[in-house]
């Protein structure tokens, strides 16, 4: 169920980035890792439409929601949209019309989260999936350690609320670390890593 693609064997640097501003893309890791996971019980062919939140949530130490929305973030969002379209899904403007919703998050400070079984996750982080007070739920086991400069993508099944506290189900996620830089070459590397996340998720198709 889990897949980990190590793109570089060099150790990742941990850098400090302010969560009050857009990420400083000149100060992030130069080596990257691509990790994906999914709910083995989900039939991804049953989904038809998707919606992507157009800003990237910045997860840091702030108690207020902050979002990354500039040219670089839009290129990252667009890359996920293209991959989902290539997988056969149709984009829709309104989240209420979508079978699945993708939200992207950027880790602005090193964050550690560990779990060994299914359960709610991130349901109290400010601004995270702020949709009608619903929480979010992973039906599969996982253990993560998130580094500064990571991007997390999560697909939510909007039609499958779980019986636990009205949580909606995360059916797929990707974790890509050390991608970003201010020049075109590093953005190309970022696009390659996003492509790799979908390449190692062959089940994610219409």
Where are these regions (language model features)?
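Stable alpha-helical elements in mature extracytoplasmic
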Residues: 40, 72, 76, 80, ...
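Post-signal peptide N-terminal segment of mature Sec-exported envelope proteins
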Residues: 28-46
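Surface-exposed short loop/turn segments
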Residues: 104-159
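C-terminal motif of bacterial Sec signal peptides marking the signal peptidase cleavage site
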Residues: 15-18
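N-terminal segment of the mature soluble domain
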Residues: 55-105
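Bacterial lipoprotein signal-peptidase II cleavage site
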Residues: 20-26
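Short secondary-structure boundary motifs at beta->alpha junctions and helix caps
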Residues: 161-197
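Bacterial N-terminal signal peptides that target proteins for export
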Residues: 1-8
């Amino acid at each position: 169920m889990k897949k980990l693609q190590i793109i570089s064997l060099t150790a990742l640097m941990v850098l400090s980035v302010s969560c009050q501003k857009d990420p400083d893309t000149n100060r992030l890791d130069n080596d990257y890792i691509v990790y994906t996971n999914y709910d083995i019980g989900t039939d991804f062919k049953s989904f038809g439409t998707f919606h992507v939140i157009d800003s990237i949530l910045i997860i840091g130490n702030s108690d207020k929601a902050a979002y990354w929305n500039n040219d670089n973030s839009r290129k990252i969002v667009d890359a996920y949209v293209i991959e989902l379209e290539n997988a056969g899904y149709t984009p829709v403007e309104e989240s209420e019309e979508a079978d699945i919703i993708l939200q992207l998050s950027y880790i602005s400070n090193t964050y550690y989260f560990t779990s060994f079984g299914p359960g709610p996750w991130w349901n109290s982080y400010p601004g995270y999936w702020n949709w009608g007070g619903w929480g979010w739920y992973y039906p599969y086991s996982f253990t993560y350690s998130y580094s500064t400069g990571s991007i997390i993508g999560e697909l939510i099944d909007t039609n499958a609320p779980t019986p636990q506290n009205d949580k909606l189900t995360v059916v797929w996620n990707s974790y890509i670390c050390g991608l970003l830089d201010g020049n075109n070459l590093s953005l190309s590397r970022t696009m390659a890593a996003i492509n790799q996340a979908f390449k190692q998720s062959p089940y994610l198709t219409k």
